[in-house]
Regions:
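Short, basic interhelical loop/turn and adjoining N-cap
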Residues: 45-49, 101-102, 149-158
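Short, charged phosphate-coordinating catalytic segments
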Residues: 29-52, 143
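Basic, Lys/Arg- and aromatic-enriched nucleic-acid-binding interface segment
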Residues: 3-34
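DNA/chromatin major-groove-contacting recognition/catalytic segments
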Residues: 157-175
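Basic, alpha-helical nucleic-acid-contacting "clamp/cap" segments
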Residues: 50, 59-96
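Short, charged amphipathic recognition helices of the HTH superfamily
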Residues: 35-36, 41, 92-93, 99, ...
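Short, leucine-enriched amphipathic alpha-helices that occur as contiguous helical runs
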Residues: 6, 10, 21-23, 103, ...
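Short, basic (Lys/Arg/His-rich) helix/loop patches that form interaction surfaces
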Residues: 108-146, 150, 166, 172-173
Length: 175
């Protein structure tokens, strides 16, 4: 279990982040299981602002499945603050309004968080933690394969196996 970040650990990590960008990176990679490439391409136009929540429209690159996620509570405030400064076609993850961040900057943000927490944090580890908690919730391995385009064997199967052996306990993700 120590190999995977729990939702509580991610909440703690988000509270210790130095920037909104780091919080958004953690939220997107952990809560929705996005890849680094998918996170870098998110535009502010993919979010629909409502009075108490945001709707986030997203299509997975690998599987082509489209989703609409509801973002609310403290994460709503975080995204609303960032989105209110952007035009529809500007990327959400950016250094300043006119300079989107690169893969290297995103990985540096994760490294900075790892230094703060004195623990290794990678995008792959965040995705594996996302899968672990989904499987622990009771999502089947077949659903994971269909949704994320997972390999039928190897690491994803071991994550599923580990989640099944630990029982079904579901602390809510970040919402």
């Amino acid at each position: 279990m120590n190999d995977y970040f729990s939702p509580e650990e991610i909440r703690t990590l988000m509270s210790r982040c130095e920037s909104d960008r780091q919080r958004i990176i953690l939220f997107l990679l952990y809560n929705y299981g996005l890849t680094v490439e998918e996170a870098l391409e998110i535009k502010s136009g993919q979010f629909m602002k409502k009075p108490d929540y945001l709707l986030f429209n997203f299509t997975r690159k690998l599987t082509g499945k489209s989703h609409t996620y509801k973002i609310q509570y403290e994460n709503y405030r975080l995204f609303y603050k960032v989105l209110s400064k952007l035009q529809d076609q500007e990327t959400v993850l950016h250094k300043d309004r006119h300079l989107p961040i690169s893969d290297t900057i995103l990985r540096k943000d994760l490294f900075d968080l790892a230094v703060i927490m004195n623990r290794k944090i990678t995008s792959a580890q965040l995705f594996e933690s996302h899968l672990y908690w989904l499987f622990k919730k009771g999502v089947s391995f077949a659903q994971g394969v269909e949704e994320y385009g997972l390999a039928l064997s190897g690491k994803p199967f071991k994550i599923w196996e580990s989640a099944m052996l630990s029982g079904r306990l579901w602390p809510f993700l970040l919402e």
